[in-house]
From Swiss-Prot:
It is an enzyme of class 2 (transferase). GO terms for molecular function: ATP binding; glycerol kinase activity; metal ion binding. PROSITE patterns: FGGY_KINASES_1 (PS00933), FGGY_KINASES_2 (PS00445). Sn-glycerol 3-phosphate binds at residues 14, 84-85, 136, 246. Pfam families: FGGY_C (PF02782), FGGY_N (PF00370). ADP binds at residues 14, 18, 268, 311, 412, 416. This is Glycerol kinase.
Amino acid sequence: MTEKKYIVALDQGTTSSRAVVMDHDANIISVSQREFEQIYPKPGWVEHDPMEIWATQSSTLVEVLAKADISADQIAAIGITNQRETTIVWEKETGKPIYNAIVWQCRRTAEICEHLKRDGLEDYIRSNTGLVIDPYFSGTKVKWILDHVEGSRERARRGELLFGTVDTWLIWKMTQGRVHVTDYTNASRTMLFNIHTLDWDDKMLEVLDIPREMLPEVRRSSEVYGQTNIGGKGGTRIPISGIAGDQQAALFGQLCVKEGMAKNTYGTGCFMLMNTGEKAVKSENGLLTTIACGPTGEVNYALEGAVFMAGASIQWLRDEMKLINDAYDSEYFATKVQNTNGVYVVPAFTGLGAPYWDPYARGAIFGLTRGVNANHIIRATLESIAYQTRDVLEAMQADSGIRLHALRVDGGAVANNFLMQFQSDILGTRVERPEVREVTALGAAYLAGLAVGFWQNLDELQEKAVIEREFRPGIETTERNYRYAGWKKAVKRAMAWEEHDE
């Protein structure tokens, strides 16, 4: 019997599919990645081809093993993490999608959402699903597909069609259609799932006219769902034993499994999640209530705040403003000046997300005087990422009544030392940057490994969560509050910029 030395994490993201091999010490042995096409049929619409998602993801799995020179029988288990909310409907018999995947960013269901608001469902949806009414979530996307593909609703009622988020689709394909399953974290992003009863919500299914027959079974984030053969029939059967949506996987990968622990992922946007333990905290401050993973993958709750523009505002400095050649240059130029010279940049290019939720806000630069140069603007843009994070954190502390002691960070922008130091300064809190930056894949691997006994419990992993660097606040409270007050003033003036009819 070959020794099972490794765990594979499949990380199916918005722009690429990745596979990561990890050993028992949580070291990354090899990584394989393939990008796939973004389809934009109309302005504001975003789709993916589900067959291409499957093709890229399955090929990275084969590639990553070949790269590491590892045979399939050395793999103890596979964990899956995925872009959340993205919606796929396919034929049970053939495994063929009846429409492209409708991606989380897609805004085509705005009108359905307006109807839900007009029907007075906001409070029901917030109380029972933990979400706000927005095209972001899967429910209205499923309705759209059933409304627009002829005969599909009847076929779904007859049990001929299946719905799934990306995790469900991948497992269906990996098990040759034997297993139709999702986990609590992904289900909590559909707007069809009751986060208190932990079951599909009959009222939401009725409102959106979605047949229950097409929905997957919902399971814990860490258990064996089925087996997959790597290398076709007769190949080694490997358990698939971990599933979590990408942000929840990152929370678990950062080992934020105790009440009050939080992480912030700095990507295109920012996603901050705080574990609230066994209490589902209803937000009064513009956050989402969502499901997270406890220490053994059981149901915990979390508060989540999404900021639309983080890394994207650095890309704007590079691509549109041409102030830098490379995102990495932003740190160099920002540190060429002592401060922003009174300038604030509000990067509300597509409106503002949490905690404001103002689609009519637009980007702005305030406080310009004759002495302001490009470096001040670069610095102010970086600072805006930290200010927006404080906005979300203040909302979290108000909702949860928990004071944060340290913020764990991950994502591309955490390599920027200036930003991380300023983040600590403006929060007045320690910022902890981990050694391993691949925390989303780590989370999926941990969930899978725990389910099959590859790791006994999280205590084994605690020492693996090495903090590479800790940033501590370096400014006085009065200075911090003065700067943050300036930011609040700037945001207020950027809000409701686009005229709209009441």
